Amino acid sequence: VDAPADMVLKAPAGAKMTKAPVDFSHKGHAALDCTKCHHKWDGKAEVKKCSAEGCHVBTSKKGKKSTPKFYSAFHSKSDISCVGCHKALKKATGPTKCGDCHPKKK
């Protein structure tokens, strides 16, 4: 799979970012199966962003729990979110606190 080595994760249009964007390393996560994060990917089609239609399109933090929220794609307790996965790993090297991923704005 051809993925960018490094990228910056930002909220999609319509969502308010309250913290700094996240520098993300695909290379640093290469040992994981791509579907760990891209859980709707079939292994063949182009990989879509989390905010793509059919995924986490709701940019609000409130509302029906059945609607996948963009925020929850990264912050839920589920092991298919960034925070949930890192907490489940319980590794000292993995970020689990807000400031670990979201550096203070300068």
Curated annotation (Swiss-Prot):
Binding sites annotated in the UniProt record for heme c 2: H39, C50, C55, H56
Electron transport is among the record's keywords: yes
Reported modifications of this chain: Binds 4 heme c groups per subunit.
Any Gene Ontology biological process: anaerobic respiration
Entry keyword Nuclease: no
A single GO molecular function term of this UniProt record: heme binding
Signal peptide annotation: none
Residue sites binding heme c 3 per the record: H29, C82, C85, H86
Superkingdom of origin organism: Bacteria
Entry keywords, A to Z: Electron transport, Heme, Iron, Metal-binding, Sulfate respiration, Transport
CDD domains noted in UniProt: Cytochrom_C3
InterPro entries: Cyt_c_III, Cyt_c_III_dom, Multihaem_cyt_sf
Amino-acid positions noted as binding heme c 1 in the UniProt annotation, renumbered to this chain: H26, C34, C37, H38
Ligand binding (heme c 4): H75, C98, C101, H102
Function: Participates in sulfate respiration coupled with phosphorylation by transferring electrons from the enzyme dehydrogenase to ferredoxin.
Other noteworthy facts: The second heme binding site has an unusual CXXXXCH motif.
The protein's name in its UniProt record: Cytochrome c3
